[in-house]
């Protein structure tokens, strides 16, 4: 069996593909797996590091806006896309994949389109509640479309072959709350807030938490991943405390989730999948510049079930934002109800189920 994954640019598009590949090779150890990507995406370094073959294609994303510079840039990008489509066709002829799996990102479109034009079986895995342009356009001819949110179904112009399978996410070893809090050097029996904004951090969230830190640690613990860009600035402004762990990156994310009672973070698809799989209540702050405002749609999917609360990025400076977080942190009954609602949205075996669907599609 030969499977070609096309997706990347960011970890949110790449790692679901990697998770599927891992499960696929467990089920079919002799399978041939390779990835298509771009030289500027995260896949350029990650895929070789993980030991998979990588095929690089020259493709760029469209520039947004109506300025002359954006229009001229897009003309060049469309010319590049035509070349990428031809290269993708050549790649598919050489690799002869049984199934092509698209997970989003700039490279996904030409590879999926070329595969569809050549009559190959294709599977689209969409991470967000508001599907990207590639998913909406190419889902019409895809063999199967797998969504992470049921809310995304309304944007797909077909019913047959559409499944809500969840988003493949990192798996964690979860410890007891007590052991996890001990790992971070926190005070036992106090509620714990976990804050993160990705490996690079989230400046607006960090600035808000910096203002709230005394109020938070007065009666609670704080585990705070600042991201690499903000760490030095913030570390210099906070006092050491037995109720605070702060670092640029959390290596043991399983312990972070195990120790926490409430999570505050962005609403990217990977974070949402981790929250649902661990059943953690959250305060979500959608990244306001995400394409199509898709993080807001992701957040609203959880808010609508009672699993989370949403604070606009522009409202983080308001006193009400701090009060929302503090009130939740000290309301164990509400946190329990939110966590239960969040857990009901979980798809912990998403990667395995998707791998099984790929195997089924690959059969003659």
Curated annotation (Swiss-Prot):
Keywords recorded for this protein, A-Z: Cell cycle, Cell division, Cell inner membrane, Cell membrane, Cell shape, Cell wall biogenesis/degradation, Glycosyltransferase, Membrane, Peptidoglycan synthesis, Transferase
CDD domains, per the entry: GT28_MurG (cd03785)
Organism, as annotated: Chlorobium limicola (strain DSM 245 / NBRC 103803 / 6330)
Lineage, opening ranks: Bacteria, Pseudomonadati, Chlorobiota, Chlorobiia, Chlorobiales
Enzyme class: transferase
Protein name: UDP-N-acetylglucosamine--N-acetylmuramyl-(pentapeptide) pyrophosphoryl-undecaprenol N-acetylglucosamine transferase
Membrane topology: Peripheral membrane protein
Chief place where the protein resides: membrane
Subcellular location: Cell inner membrane
Entry's family note: Belongs to the glycosyltransferase 28 family. MurG subfamily.
Gene3D superfamilies reported for this sequence: Glycogen Phosphorylase B (3.40.50.2000)
Pfam families, alphabetized: Glyco_tran_28_C, Glyco_transf_28
One of the record's GO molecular function terms: UDP-N-acetyl-D-glucosamine:N-acetylmuramoyl-L-alanyl-D-glutamyl-meso-2,6-diaminopimelyl-D-alanyl-D-alanine-diphosphoundecaprenol 4-beta-N-acetylglucosaminlytransferase activity
Transmembrane segments: none
Catalytic activity from the UniProt record: di-trans,octa-cis-undecaprenyl diphospho-N-acetyl-alpha-D-muramoyl-L-alanyl-D-glutamyl-meso-2,6-diaminopimeloyl-D-alanyl-D-alanine + UDP-N-acetyl-alpha-D-glucosamine = di-trans,octa-cis-undecaprenyl diphospho-[N-acetyl-alpha-D-glucosaminyl-(1->4)]-N-acetyl-alpha-D-muramoyl-L-alanyl-D-glutamyl-meso-2,6-diaminopimeloyl-D-alanyl-D-alanine + UDP + H(+)
InterPro entries given in the database record: GlcNAc_MurG, Glyco_trans_28_C, GlycoTrans_28_N
Functional pathway: Cell wall biogenesis; peptidoglycan biosynthesis
Record's GO cellular component terms: plasma membrane
